Curated annotation (Swiss-Prot):
Catalyzes the isomerization between 2-isopropylmalate and 3-isopropylmalate, via the formation of 2-isopropylmaleate. NCBIfam families: leuD, PRK01641.1. GO terms for cellular component: 3-isopropylmalate dehydratase complex. It is an enzyme of class 4 (lyase). The lineage of its organism: Bacteria, Bacillati, Actinomycetota, Actinomycetes, Propionibacteriales. It catalyses: (2R,3S)-3-isopropylmalate = (2S)-2-isopropylmalate. One of its GO terms (biological process) is L-leucine biosynthetic process. The keyword Signal does not apply. This is 3-isopropylmalate dehydratase small subunit. It comes from the Bacteria. GO terms for molecular function: 3-isopropylmalate dehydratase activity. Pathway: Amino-acid biosynthesis; L-leucine biosynthesis; L-leucine from 3-methyl-2-oxobutanoate: step 2/4. The keyword GTP-binding does not apply. Belongs to the LeuD family. LeuD type 1 subfamily. It comes from Nocardioides sp. (strain ATCC BAA-499 / JS614).
Length: 202
């Protein structure tokens, strides 16, 4: 998992609330056995509508999704995070996230930045008026900045210290485990040989 410190990218306004994981990626797209290739299923039902924001060329290459409250509700679905990442999103900004989605995001390297609802509304308005506007998210200072000059919007965002640490260090669950490799090896070296053990796959 790559380390996350700051990211600047085109912001895209998703003016919808209560977006659940089945809307993010329908279950029919969950049959792959890898973590890649899910971008085609992202918001699949909505993308059939030519007026849907992801179909607007003004937001081409967007990597910062600015969504309404209660984003990522519904069933726990890592694929929802993977679909967002496969599409190119590095950050989702919302006034409120479902706990499970926020947890899955942190483990996979997608930053879920929680800001006040009034901030989301201001960013939406700015992005609507100026498609292609860049949004900078700084994890070290926990700040979001959209636009430049007198029209710029800057605000702090909330993220728990543990998830922030994982993202800054680029640590997924396997990375955290490998950080204890010496202790694990030391334990295994003194473990009685008659006890059950796993073996390396060939």
């Amino acid at each position: 998992m790559d380390k996350f410190t700051t990211h600047t990218g085109v912001g895209i306004p998703l003016r919808r609330s209560n977006v659940d994981t089945d809307q993010i990626i329908p279950a029919v797209y969950l049959k792959r056995v890898t973590r890649t290739g899910f971008e085609d299923g992202l918001f699949a039902a909505w993308r059939n509508d030519p007026s849907f924001v992801l179909n607007n060329e003004g937001y081409a290459g967007a990597s910062v999704l600015v969504a309404g409250p209660d984003f990522g509700t519904g069933s726990s679905r890592e694929h929802a995070v993977w679909a967002l990442q496969n599409y190119g999103f590095k950050v989702v900004i919302s006034p409120r996230f479902a706990d499970i989605f926020r947890g899955n995001s942190g483990k996979a390297g997608l930053l879920a930045a929680q800001v006040d609802e009034s901030v989301v509304q201001k960013i939406w308005d700015l992005l609507d008026e100026h498609p292609g506007t860049a949004v900078t998210v700084d994890l070290e200072s926990r700040t979001v900045r959209a636009g430049e000059g007198v029209d710029a919007i800057e605000a702090s965002f909330d993220i728990d210290d543990y998830t922030r640490w994982r993202l800054l260090e680029g640590l997924d669950d396997i990375g955290i485990t490998l950080g204890h490799a010496d202790a694990i090896a030391s334990y295994e070296a003194t473990r009685p040989s008659w006890r059950p053990a796993t073996i390396h796959a060939h």
